[in-house]
From Swiss-Prot:
Protein name, as recorded: Undecaprenyl-diphosphatase
Pfam families hit by this protein: BacA (PF02673)
Species this chain originates from: Salinibacter ruber (strain DSM 13855 / M31)
Record's keyword annotation contains Hydrolase: yes
Entry's EC annotation: 3.6.1.27
Record bears the keyword Cell inner membrane: yes
Sequence similarity: Belongs to the UppP family.
Any single Gene Ontology cellular-component annotation: plasma membrane
Regions that span the bilayer: 1-21, 92-112, 119-139, 150-170, 193-213, 223-243, 250-270
Alphabetical list of InterPro entries matching this protein: UppP
The reaction(s) this protein catalyses: di-trans,octa-cis-undecaprenyl diphosphate + H2O = di-trans,octa-cis-undecaprenyl phosphate + phosphate + H(+)
Amino acid sequence: MTWWEALLLGLIQGLTEFIPVSSSGHLVLGQYLLGLDKEAADVTFEVFVHFGTVLSILTVYWDDVAELVEEAWAGLRAPRAVPTRFAENDTFRLGVFILVTLVPTGVAYVLFREPLEQAFGSPRFTSAMLVGTGVLLLLTRIGPRPDGDLSGVKAFVVGVAQSCALVPGISRSGATICTALYQNVAPERAANFSFLMLLPVVLGGTVLKGLELMEQGVGAAGLSLGIGTVAAYGSGIGAIYVVLDVVRRGNLQYFAYYCFLIGGLGLWLL
């Protein structure tokens, strides 16, 4: 992988991890169009660019993450007070909701890991799923503006949506934000929850891929990996702020049009 290919794919990863247009879908299509060997690119490169997106979340949400860790530690130190903390502390409750989303996502990954990995080899299937993401985004225009809060049930349903986004072409941020909005969760709350709940998922995936990488060895040049990581980090920070602004304004349909365009072109040309 050349440095400019690493730069391009790093930018794609950072932008599309948070902008609701499917990072996995764009990496599949990008690697296909660049003629990269998927087996060599995925294991090595994805570990590093996902680390870049982890740093993006930590940079933007450092105060929130620090509070979540503090509340989790307090809960572990005083388990008998957990019900009270859950009822009275918004941050502690948010942490519990994030844990709830991991249940359906983890189950889906364990049960369907093999077919999911096979799906990453089909650019046409990925293109079709991008069109599906566009439909999800467009449906947010229906109905009144949401103004509610999260609950345990809503968080679980959002987790189910996140598990569906394991399929390449289905945007994780798009599926989770839209599902929260469909359940009358206020837009900014929905977007912030979507980004915070991504952190343990990406960390877990990075660790698993990292272990695989240790067995296989680094397949790409160190310079290219560094460039890709920095590109993913910088573009990821910008993408988070862009999405927060778009969600506040209720304009997710613009991303839907983009998904229709890219997905349609993929179905036509690939």
